[in-house]
Amino acid sequence: MTTSVTIPKTAGVNPLKGLLEYGQSPWMDYIRRDLLTGGGLKQMINDDGLRGMTSNPAIFEKSIVGSTLYSDILTSAEAKTLDAKGLYEKIAIRDVQDACDIFKPVYQQTHRRDGYVSLEVSPYLANDTKGTLEEARRLWKTVGRENLMIKVPGTPEGLPAIRQLLEDGLNINITLLFAQSAYEQVAEAFLAALEARALKGLDISHSASVASFFVSRIDTLVDSKLDEVVK
Protein backbone atom coordinates (compact mmCIF):
# COMPACT_ATOMS: atom_id res chain seq x y z
CA MET A 1 0.00 0.00 0.00
CA THR A 2 1.31 3.43 -0.93
CA THR A 3 0.64 6.50 1.18
CA SER A 4 1.41 10.10 0.50
CA VAL A 5 1.55 13.35 2.41
CA THR A 6 0.19 16.55 0.93
CA ILE A 7 1.90 19.72 2.09
CA PRO A 8 -0.74 22.44 2.54
CA LYS A 9 -0.13 25.41 0.27
CA THR A 10 -0.66 28.02 2.93
CA ALA A 11 -0.18 31.57 1.73
CA GLY A 12 3.30 32.82 2.48
CA VAL A 13 4.63 29.40 3.52
CA ASN A 14 7.42 27.83 1.48
CA PRO A 15 6.37 24.21 0.68
CA LEU A 16 9.95 23.02 1.22
CA LYS A 17 10.08 24.65 4.63
CA GLY A 18 6.70 23.07 5.36
CA LEU A 19 8.37 19.66 5.19
CA LEU A 20 10.00 20.40 8.54
CA GLU A 21 6.57 20.22 10.19
CA TYR A 22 6.37 16.59 9.10
CA GLY A 23 9.76 15.67 10.52
CA GLN A 24 11.40 15.72 7.08
CA SER A 25 14.83 17.29 6.58
CA PRO A 26 15.54 18.39 2.98
CA TRP A 27 19.13 17.93 1.84
CA MET A 28 20.73 19.19 -1.35
CA ASP A 29 22.84 16.86 -3.48
CA TYR A 30 25.00 19.65 -4.90
CA ILE A 31 27.83 22.00 -3.96
CA ARG A 32 29.52 24.89 -5.73
CA ARG A 33 31.82 27.67 -4.63
CA ASP A 34 29.49 30.59 -5.37
CA LEU A 35 26.74 29.06 -3.22
CA LEU A 36 29.12 29.23 -0.28
CA THR A 37 30.65 32.64 -0.88
CA GLY A 38 27.68 34.50 -2.37
CA GLY A 39 25.14 33.84 0.36
CA GLY A 40 23.06 31.40 -1.69
CA LEU A 41 23.44 28.51 0.73
CA LYS A 42 22.58 30.66 3.74
CA GLN A 43 19.47 31.87 1.93
CA MET A 44 18.34 28.32 1.17
CA ILE A 45 18.84 27.37 4.81
CA ASN A 46 16.82 30.36 6.03
CA ASP A 47 14.13 30.54 3.33
CA ASP A 48 13.77 26.92 2.20
CA GLY A 49 14.53 25.01 5.38
CA LEU A 50 17.55 23.25 3.86
CA ARG A 51 19.02 20.95 6.49
CA GLY A 52 22.01 19.25 4.89
CA MET A 53 24.23 18.88 1.84
CA THR A 54 26.01 16.07 0.05
CA SER A 55 28.88 16.08 -2.41
CA ASN A 56 30.72 13.60 -4.59
CA PRO A 57 33.45 13.68 -7.24
CA ALA A 58 30.90 13.92 -10.08
CA ILE A 59 29.27 16.98 -8.53
CA PHE A 60 32.63 18.68 -8.08
CA GLU A 61 33.58 17.84 -11.66
CA LYS A 62 30.52 19.69 -12.95
CA SER A 63 31.21 22.64 -10.68
CA ILE A 64 34.87 22.86 -11.69
CA VAL A 65 34.51 22.26 -15.44
CA GLY A 66 31.45 24.46 -15.80
CA SER A 67 32.86 27.58 -14.15
CA THR A 68 35.95 29.64 -13.30
CA LEU A 69 35.11 29.60 -9.60
CA TYR A 70 38.14 27.48 -8.74
CA SER A 71 40.75 29.31 -10.79
CA ASP A 72 42.50 30.54 -7.64
CA ILE A 73 43.43 26.95 -6.75
CA LEU A 74 43.86 25.59 -10.27
CA THR A 75 46.29 28.36 -11.27
CA SER A 76 48.18 28.54 -7.98
CA ALA A 77 51.83 27.62 -7.62
CA GLU A 78 50.83 24.74 -5.36
CA ALA A 79 48.62 23.28 -8.10
CA LYS A 80 51.71 22.56 -10.17
CA THR A 81 52.95 20.21 -7.45
CA LEU A 82 49.68 18.27 -7.08
CA ASP A 83 48.29 15.37 -9.08
CA ALA A 84 44.61 15.17 -10.06
CA LYS A 85 43.59 13.62 -6.74
CA GLY A 86 45.51 16.24 -4.81
CA LEU A 87 43.84 19.07 -6.72
CA TYR A 88 40.41 17.53 -6.24
CA GLU A 89 40.92 17.18 -2.50
CA LYS A 90 42.24 20.73 -2.21
CA ILE A 91 39.06 22.03 -3.82
CA ALA A 92 36.64 19.61 -2.17
CA ILE A 93 37.97 19.97 1.36
CA ARG A 94 37.86 23.78 1.24
CA ASP A 95 34.27 23.79 -0.02
CA VAL A 96 33.13 21.14 2.46
CA GLN A 97 34.77 22.99 5.37
CA ASP A 98 33.01 26.21 4.38
CA ALA A 99 29.69 24.40 3.92
CA CYS A 100 30.05 22.78 7.35
CA ASP A 101 30.63 26.21 8.88
CA ILE A 102 27.52 27.62 7.19
CA PHE A 103 25.43 24.68 8.43
CA LYS A 104 26.89 24.86 11.95
CA PRO A 105 23.99 26.94 13.37
CA VAL A 106 21.51 24.32 12.07
CA TYR A 107 23.65 21.59 13.62
CA GLN A 108 23.60 23.36 16.97
CA GLN A 109 19.96 24.47 16.92
CA THR A 110 18.71 20.96 16.08
CA HIS A 111 20.96 19.40 18.73
CA ARG A 112 23.01 17.55 16.09
CA ARG A 113 20.01 16.06 14.30
CA ASP A 114 20.59 18.11 11.13
CA GLY A 115 23.22 20.39 9.63
CA TYR A 116 25.57 17.80 8.13
CA VAL A 117 27.69 18.00 4.98
CA SER A 118 28.88 14.80 3.30
CA LEU A 119 32.26 14.11 1.70
CA GLU A 120 32.87 10.84 -0.12
CA VAL A 121 35.80 8.47 0.18
CA SER A 122 37.31 7.55 -3.18
CA PRO A 123 35.00 5.32 -5.28
CA TYR A 124 38.09 3.25 -6.07
CA LEU A 125 38.02 2.02 -2.46
CA ALA A 126 34.49 0.58 -2.61
CA ASN A 127 35.90 -2.96 -2.34
CA ASP A 128 38.80 -2.16 -0.02
CA THR A 129 38.00 -2.25 3.71
CA LYS A 130 41.44 -1.21 4.92
CA GLY A 131 41.75 1.55 2.33
CA THR A 132 38.30 2.89 3.22
CA LEU A 133 39.16 3.01 6.91
CA GLU A 134 42.40 4.86 6.27
CA GLU A 135 40.93 7.40 3.87
CA ALA A 136 37.83 8.07 5.96
CA ARG A 137 39.93 8.76 9.05
CA ARG A 138 42.30 10.97 7.07
CA LEU A 139 39.46 13.02 5.55
CA TRP A 140 37.74 13.34 8.93
CA LYS A 141 40.91 14.67 10.51
CA THR A 142 41.76 16.96 7.59
CA VAL A 143 38.33 18.57 7.32
CA GLY A 144 38.14 18.95 11.08
CA ARG A 145 34.42 19.72 11.39
CA GLU A 146 32.14 17.86 13.81
CA ASN A 147 29.17 18.18 11.42
CA LEU A 148 31.00 16.40 8.61
CA MET A 149 29.64 13.09 7.35
CA ILE A 150 31.90 10.68 5.53
CA LYS A 151 30.19 8.84 2.68
CA VAL A 152 31.03 5.13 2.64
CA PRO A 153 29.42 2.64 0.23
CA GLY A 154 27.35 -0.17 1.72
CA THR A 155 29.30 -2.85 -0.13
CA PRO A 156 30.31 -6.14 1.54
CA GLU A 157 33.79 -4.67 2.03
CA GLY A 158 32.36 -1.35 3.15
CA LEU A 159 30.27 -2.82 5.97
CA PRO A 160 33.19 -3.65 8.32
CA ALA A 161 34.61 -0.18 7.70
CA ILE A 162 31.24 1.44 8.43
CA ARG A 163 30.93 -0.41 11.71
CA GLN A 164 34.46 0.46 12.84
CA LEU A 165 34.22 4.11 11.80
CA LEU A 166 30.95 4.53 13.68
CA GLU A 167 32.54 2.88 16.70
CA ASP A 168 35.40 5.36 16.36
CA GLY A 169 32.90 8.22 16.57
CA LEU A 170 32.79 9.38 12.95
CA ASN A 171 29.51 10.43 11.32
CA ILE A 172 28.79 8.16 8.36
CA ASN A 173 26.53 8.55 5.31
CA ILE A 174 26.05 5.04 3.91
CA THR A 175 25.54 5.01 0.14
CA LEU A 176 25.01 2.53 -2.71
CA LEU A 177 21.94 1.01 -1.09
CA PHE A 178 19.44 -0.56 -3.46
CA ALA A 179 17.68 -3.26 -1.40
CA GLN A 180 15.99 -3.77 1.96
CA SER A 181 18.45 -6.54 2.78
CA ALA A 182 21.35 -4.11 2.31
CA TYR A 183 19.64 -1.62 4.62
CA GLU A 184 19.17 -4.31 7.26
CA GLN A 185 22.90 -5.06 7.14
CA VAL A 186 23.95 -1.45 7.60
CA ALA A 187 21.36 -0.97 10.36
CA GLU A 188 22.86 -3.95 12.18
CA ALA A 189 26.34 -2.48 11.70
CA PHE A 190 25.15 0.83 13.17
CA LEU A 191 23.61 -0.85 16.23
CA ALA A 192 26.69 -3.03 16.74
CA ALA A 193 28.89 0.08 16.66
CA LEU A 194 26.72 1.82 19.26
CA GLU A 195 26.84 -1.24 21.51
CA ALA A 196 30.63 -1.37 21.20
CA ARG A 197 30.93 2.32 22.12
CA ALA A 198 28.58 1.89 25.06
CA LEU A 199 30.58 -1.07 26.38
CA LYS A 200 33.68 1.13 26.28
CA GLY A 201 31.86 3.81 28.26
CA LEU A 202 31.88 6.20 25.30
CA ASP A 203 29.12 8.70 24.54
CA ILE A 204 26.61 7.45 21.96
CA SER A 205 24.23 10.43 22.07
CA HIS A 206 26.19 12.21 19.34
CA SER A 207 26.56 9.25 16.97
CA ALA A 208 25.05 10.22 13.61
CA SER A 209 24.50 8.19 10.49
CA VAL A 210 22.15 8.20 7.50
CA ALA A 211 21.31 5.53 4.93
CA SER A 212 21.12 6.90 1.38
CA PHE A 213 18.98 4.97 -1.07
CA PHE A 214 19.71 5.72 -4.73
CA VAL A 215 16.07 6.30 -5.66
CA SER A 216 17.02 8.17 -8.84
CA ARG A 217 18.90 5.13 -10.13
CA ILE A 218 15.84 2.95 -9.55
CA ASP A 219 13.61 5.54 -11.23
CA THR A 220 15.88 5.61 -14.27
CA LEU A 221 15.84 1.82 -14.56
CA VAL A 222 12.06 1.62 -14.17
CA ASP A 223 11.58 4.39 -16.74
CA SER A 224 13.66 2.48 -19.28
CA LYS A 225 11.63 -0.68 -18.64
CA LEU A 226 8.39 1.25 -19.09
CA ASP A 227 9.67 2.67 -22.36
CA GLU A 228 10.31 -0.89 -23.57
CA VAL A 229 6.79 -1.95 -22.62
CA VAL A 230 5.24 1.04 -24.41
CA LYS A 231 7.21 0.25 -27.57
Regions found by a protein language model. Give the residues of each.
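Active-site-adjacent beta->alpha loops and helix N-cap segments on the catalytic face
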Residues: L35, D128-E134, V152-L166, A179-L191
